[in-house]
Curated annotation (Swiss-Prot):
Protein name: NADH-quinone oxidoreductase subunit B 2
Cellular component aspect of the GO annotation: plasma membrane; respiratory chain complex I
Cofactor requirement: [4Fe-4S] cluster
EC primary class: translocase
Species, as recorded: Cereibacter sphaeroides (strain ATCC 17025 / ATH 2.4.3) (Rhodobacter sphaeroides)
Compartment(s) where it occurs, according to its Swiss-Prot or TrEMBL record: Cell inner membrane
Length: 174
């Protein structure tokens, strides 16, 4: 059965004809959800949870060479004002409750980017008794950025993937 849409009803198909008619007259047809998701992706505020050497690359991403603010992403110091938490580096067992506390202080919808091998799965210190083997055991992670340490370009790509995912799926359901 090729050509059969098994993913469900495509709501854009219904509005495409009406949208074409109204475009000539200067109107735009969209849904409130699409408008909110568009605005949300253009104003992501991230806070750093830098724990090791990956944090240096995270800071490098926010410098003028990469200028992440042109993508609508700006750093914030308080978890109460941020939408995205970037966990960069080795998460120890002692630091895990603090990570969860900061995550709980963030307003909904909140997103987490895990940056680097240590944050993704323990990395070089995976078999150490004091290391959490991935921050996804403490908080739900939306985007994983691989590398040891990942480059600033890799983090920027991860941020753009998060924006794309929010636009495509709306508020990510957990």
């Amino acid at each position: 059965m090729t050509g059969l849409n098994t993913a469900g009803h495509d709501r854009d198909y219904d509005t495409a004809g009406l949208n074409r008619e109204l475009q000539d007259k200067g109107f735009l047809l969209t849904t409130t959800e699409d408008l909110i998701n568009w605005a949300r992706t253009g104003s992501l505020h991230w806070m750093t949870f830098g724990l090791a050497c990956c944090a240096v690359e995270m800071m490098h991403t926010s410098m003028p060479r990469y200028d992440v603010e042109r993508f609508g992403v700006a750093p914030r110091a308080s978890p109460r004002q941020s939408d995205v938490m970037i966990v960069a580096g080795t998460l120890t067992n002692k630091m895990a409750p603090a990570l969860r506390k900061v995550y709980d202080q963030m307003p909904e919808p909140r997103y987490v980017i895990s940056m680097g091998s240590c944050a993704n799965g323990g990395g070089y210190y995976h078999y150490s008794y004091s290391v959490v083997r991935g921050c996804d055991r403490i908080v739900p992670v939306d985007i994983y950025v691989p590398g040891c340490p990942p480059t600033a370009e890799a983090l920027l790509y991860g941020i753009l993937q998060l924006q794309r995912r929010i636009r495509r799926t709306g508020t990510i359901t957990r």
